[in-house]
Amino acid sequence: MRIGIDLGGTKTEVIALGDAGEQLYRHRLPTPRDDYRQTIETIATLVDMAEQATGQRGTVGMGIPGSISPYTGVVKNANSTWLNGQPFDKDLSARLQREVRLANDANCLAVSEAVDGAAAGAQTVFAVIIGTGCGAGVAFNGRAHIGGNGTAGEWGHNPLPWMDEDELRYREEVPCYCGKQGCIETFISGTGFAMDYRRLSGHALKGSEIIRLVEESDPVAELALRRYELRLAKSLAHVVNILDPDVIVLGGGMSNVDRLYQTVGQLIKQFVFGGECETPVRKAKHGDSSGVRGAAWLWPQE
């Protein structure tokens, strides 16, 4: 049995999968924000609940909104900031009395979709989480690729490519929380989409409300979405030029905008070197379960 844990900002979730990937158990508990030791205890409780419910002992994989530095062995770049600077995998392994495999939550999405999701069987998968922020992960042959520095997939903190004059102005107006300017995340996260609509219309709306206006043929909402589609396509074309994945998978709140799957693939061709690109852009099959399923699959079938 494989147990996966997904640590989110508000909830921590466990899933137990059987040998064929079937769900045996799933449960959520509130994430104890700003309390490192209680976070470990919450995870231990969830693992115990899964094992009690199934009557089996499982391997444990963990997805977090950050990564482990290969140089210091502690968590870095986590927006769950109380994890930063902590040897989280070692402390969790000691508490659970077994090895715990840990990966960035976007890498878990990539693994999940590569194993039995929208990119099942693909050799190279690039998976994107587009929600409040913007992260990405890479899977090779169903296994997470973290890179030599532990930063593979940190796509959202590269500059938006091929900026037009308006985007150059926006870059100066809205710096990224990472301290740099012009990051992809500031443009194509759900937050960035809503902010661009506000710049165009003068009204603050949620992403879902803007999409509803698009469906009602509102011209300003339509313009905001077209700008978003082009920015997403430019950003993904950079990935194709460097990595050339077999499949691109979208997860997170913006992945529910169905029109993206008709438009973005064609727009990518305008920016890929040589103009040829048939890389499919697909919606995550497992939805909000992908991260926790991918954490479980950090222990692959041998």
Curated annotation (Swiss-Prot):
Name of the top EC class for this enzyme: transferase
One example GO MF annotation: mannokinase activity
Assigned GO CC terms: cytosol
E.C. designation(s): 2.7.1.4
Substrates-to-products reaction catalysed: D-fructose + ATP = D-fructose 6-phosphate + ADP + H(+)
Keyword Transferase found: yes
UniProt KW keywords: ATP-binding, Carbohydrate metabolism, Kinase, Nucleotide-binding, Transferase
Positions of ATP binding: 4-11, 133-140
Position of the signal peptide: none
InterPro entries listed in its UniProt record: ATPase_NBD, ROK, ROK_cs
Family of the protein in this entry: Belongs to the ROK (NagC/XylR) family.
Name of this protein: Fructokinase
Organism of provenance: Escherichia coli (strain K12)
Gene: mak
